[in-house]
């Protein structure tokens, strides 16, 4: 059962902050920090044992306090943290015409249990609603309270999407990509009805409690160990290994890593975020931010020249290895093995439970399992959107389209350009 107040009949100017005088006060109780510009809209979604009231905000800055507070107790990846998405919006989203649509879900006790960071792309072509950060995020998903995941039904998710689309208005396409099958220990109800996409997630390495355990099982795998590689590199020059670099060196190393990694797509996994406009500025801004303690930048240098480097994120007892830069040489191959072993050792010491090789191929494939499946769903919400989606799926069936950015996809957008 779904109950909702009629939200239609407003002009776009009326919806700019998604609030009117008739909307009523912001919620009280445990989550009083909801910004006053959020809409107390009365959208009510009833699931199996959860009744959610949705509130929508179109300002990332005004959502900061409640977002940061909620992400500390919610199930989420680093790609849905405020630090990540606020930097993404400033450097990638806003310049490309994406408008934020931040959805808060409250339970019957007015406790925040759901946060859906969405973006509406409307600069050109069909108006597309997608996860905020789409195209750069390794995984797209909401932030969810663990208690909600225990009872949340796919039918409730469908109702939420319908209410959001009705509220935003004039949405042509709902596009949901790179969605993981699991949210923490729970099945992700937001992949209900979605298809397995061609792009996979990262290869997961589950870490033991001690380095000795890892060494006993894995160090003999491969032609050379990290120790062998270290001895080899010391013969080449002065070897330095920097893990978790501080802010200023971190920014300079990020520039080097991105410059090399862009030209070495073969060393990347299927997740390669470096082709999107504004990504370089995004990573540098993230590296310089003192508030982003989860960002990890590491490098192996010989005579002060970077041979291998990586950018990763620590979140929820998992290290997400997102970008790697390896020199195409014997020195680079040795530095890669040494860097990965040192990262693994450091993670074990810090008590991190796993490493997700999201943007890299493990130095030794036997270390990890198969890539995790990711799910995508794309649906037309208007006649224009249905036509675009139909052409896109037809193109894929004919083998003409493999991504949103290829020639066929561009042609489809031009055909229906607003």
Name each model feature, range by range.
Residues 46-47, 134-136, 233-236:
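Short, flexible turn/loop "capping" segments at secondary-structure junctions
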Residues 133, 157-160, 216-224, 392-397:
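Short intrinsically disordered coil segments
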Residues 52-129, 179-201, 216-332:
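A conserved beta-strand-loop-helix scaffold within acyl/acetyltransferase catalytic domains
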Residues 74-78, 168, 172, 261-269, ...:
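A generic secondary-structure signal for well-formed alpha-helical elements
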Residues 144-146, 205-207, 245:
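Short beta-strand-to-loop capping motifs
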Residues 99-100, 107, 121-198, 315-376:
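Acyl-donor binding region in acyl/amide transferases
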Residues 2-51, 60, 180-217, 296, ...:
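Active-site/acyl-donor-binding loops of N-acyltransferases
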Residues 169, 224-235, 397-405:
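Short, cationic low-complexity segments
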